From Swiss-Prot:
Homotetramer at high temperature; homodimer at room temperature. It comes from Sulfolobus acidocaldarius (strain ATCC 33909 / DSM 639 / JCM 8929 / NBRC 15157 / NCIMB 11770). Pfam families: Sod_Fe_C (PF02777), Sod_Fe_N (PF00081). This is Superoxide dismutase [Fe]. Its cofactor is Fe cation. Its main location: cytoplasm. Transmembrane segments: none annotated. GO terms for molecular function: metal ion binding; superoxide dismutase activity. It is found in: Cytoplasm. Destroys superoxide anion radicals which are normally produced within the cells and which are toxic to biological systems. Fe cation binds at H34, H85, D171, H175. GO terms for cellular component: cytoplasm.
Length: 211
């Protein structure tokens, strides 16, 4: 009996709000292109590479007719792109529902480590502004130390960073802001704080605290 080899494909998630919901802080045009163009492209890219990997595993691709390292690198890039964007969308909420300050355990950890939310916001923003080129700034929970850690990531083709216990993330690729803010990334970051979904960030933290 021949064993069936099948790799599960990724699904393009539904945006948790309308494309104009984050205005005036992030424009409808940006969300439309970012979500329907770039994010969908990562999902399609990952699935296309899974098709190729599946054929390779089955022996349908003769040796010398594929670049295994290229497939694996491409999968890392596209899977990270998909998963990080899924977190990014849910990490934001429409104007009026997002922004402000966190509460609960997240607020307690921030105050314990930074003394105040304002100081945390300053350090996170400075970290984001210091990122050279495109990438992400990530707040994640370190399971070993119990600390919140800030990390900047150039691009997303190195390791599966999306599998970290991510609490909060901001996209710093130009497609996330250039249509509205041009080369003023700092203005985009300042605007982004007004749509941060702290309820989602708290839920993500609770999930990791309860493991």
């Amino acid at each position: 009996m021949t064993q069936v080899i099948q790799l599960k494909r990724y699904e393009f998630p539904q945006l948790p709000y309308k494309v104009d919901a984050l205005e005036p802080y992030i424009s409808k045009d940006i969300i439309d292109v970012h979500y329907n163009g770039h994010h969908k492209g990562y999902v399609n890219g990952a699935n296309s590479l899974l098709d190729r990997l599946e054929k390779l595993i089955k022996g349908d691709l003769p040796q010398g007719q594929y670049d295994l390292q290229g497939i694996l690198r491409g999968l890392t890039f596209n899977i990270n792109g998909h998963k990080l964007h899924a977190i990014y969308w849910n990490n934001m909420a429409p104007a009026g529902k997002g922004g402000g300050k966190p509460g609960g355990a997240l607020a307690d950890l921030i105050n314990k480590q930074y003394g105040s939310f304002d100081r945390f916001k300053q350090v996170f923003s400075e970290s984001a502004n210091s990122l050279p080129g495109s990438g992400w700034t990530v707040l994640y929970y370190d399971n070993e130390s119990g600390n919140l850690q800030i990390m900047t990531v150039e691009n997303h083709f190195m390791n599966h960073i999306a599998e970290l216990p991510v609490i909060l993330i901001v996209d710093e690729f130009e497609h996330a802001y250039y249509l509205q803010y041009k080369n003023k990334r700092g203005d985009y970051l300042n605007a982004w704080w007004n749509v941060v979904n702290w309820d989602d960030a708290e839920k993500r933290l609770q999930k990791y605290l309860n493991k």
